Amino acid sequence: MPIHNLNHVNMFLQVIASGSISSAARILRKSHTAVSSAVSNLEIDLCVELVRRDGYKVEPTEQALRLIPYMRSLLNYQQLIGDIAFNLNKGPRNLRVLLDTAIPPSFCDTVSSVLLDDFNMVSLIRTSPADSLATIKQDNAEIDIAITIDEELKISRFNQCVLGYTKAFVVAHPQHPLCNASLHSIASLANYRQISLGSRSGQHSNLLRPVSDKVLFVENFDDMLRLVEAGVGWGIAPHYFVEERLRNGTLAVLSELYEPGGIDTKVYCYYNTALESERSFLRFLESARQRLRELGRQRFDDAPAWQPSIVETAQRRSGPKALAYRQRAAPE
């Protein structure tokens, strides 16, 4: 009675745990038909009836209850054998990791050190957020992990998860007309020239598509901020690029009224599906999430050293929203 596909065992156990095929399909992100067929095929392999169907509900048979502990052990052995095989073959494997330039350098150092605990070689590749996803889709890129602020729901060969958040700011030269405008949201900036990251492919995801119709594209954040400091337009940049300039007064924050403390930006991890079953990779994900949380707390503690107060920010603006901020922030 050979079991032809261990994925069928995993799906069957999920059906029993959730109580229905529909629930298991949602959890596993599979179609109802795929999960139902997996259970049926497993019954054929084992020559026993495993479930009783009662409408939408599914209950295990007595034979299934006796087999379930062995099935769980089988999956545990599969994981163990996979880990052993991975370690035997690890050798000089070169894990290629792409990190876009919106990710803080201190986080990149953490990524490298954590991965080197389990992989002999790690190559870190830095690229613009506007090009990150296009890069991992190239067949010759051979990227294993990509950490980026850009988002795409489905990419062949890759799974996606969220590691945490980083901060970004909308900035302009202190003498830019926007510094005296009433800004209710980022949409208020649409009529002014934006300095934005350009994609080599000429296409942008919805997340990174420019807000303004008047756009000047550049290749990197350094070029963006040089033009912003020259008064050419406004831009959106990661916190670690702009905080020194904010302290020096060469840039002003435009997003403080509607996003105090910076704009929360999700950090996504796209990883080759082959890594999903490796415990070392799961440990890396947890370490990466923890490091992002630590960086966020550290920024919060350091923020008062440079961040303007609500009163100071509001006094640089005009209009009803600025007046409301002044009234709320005024001392008793």
From Swiss-Prot:
Residues 21-40 bind DNA. GO terms for molecular function: DNA binding; DNA-binding transcription factor activity. GO terms for biological process: regulation of DNA-templated transcription; regulation of transmembrane transport. InterPro entries: LTTR, LysR_subst-bd, Tscrpt_reg_HTH_LysR, WH-like_DNA-bd_sf, WH_DNA-bd_sf. The keyword DNA-binding applies. PROSITE patterns: HTH_LYSR. One of its GO terms (cellular component) is extracellular region. Both 3,4-dihydroxy-2-heptylquinoline (PQS) and its precursor 4-hydroxy-2-heptylquinoline (HHQ) function as ligands and promote MvfR DNA-binding activity leading to transcriptional activation. It is found in: Cell inner membrane; Secreted. Keywords: Cell inner membrane, Cell membrane, DNA-binding, Membrane, Secreted, Transcription, Transcription regulation, Virulence. Gene3D superfamilies: 3.40.190.290, Winged helix-like DNA-binding domain superfamily/Winged helix DNA-binding domain. Residues 4-61 form the HTH lysR-type domain. Pfam families: HTH_1, LysR_substrate. Belongs to the LysR transcriptional regulatory family. Transcription regulator that plays a critical role in virulence by positively regulating the expression of multiple quorum sensing (QS)-regulated virulence factors, genes involved in protein secretion, translation, response to oxidative stress and the phnAB operon. At the stationary phase, negatively autoregulates its function through cleavage and translocation to the extracellular space. This is Multiple virulence factor regulator MvfR. It comes from Pseudomonas aeruginosa (strain ATCC 15692 / DSM 22644 / CIP 104116 / JCM 14847 / LMG 12228 / 1C / PRS 101 / PAO1). The gene is mvfR.
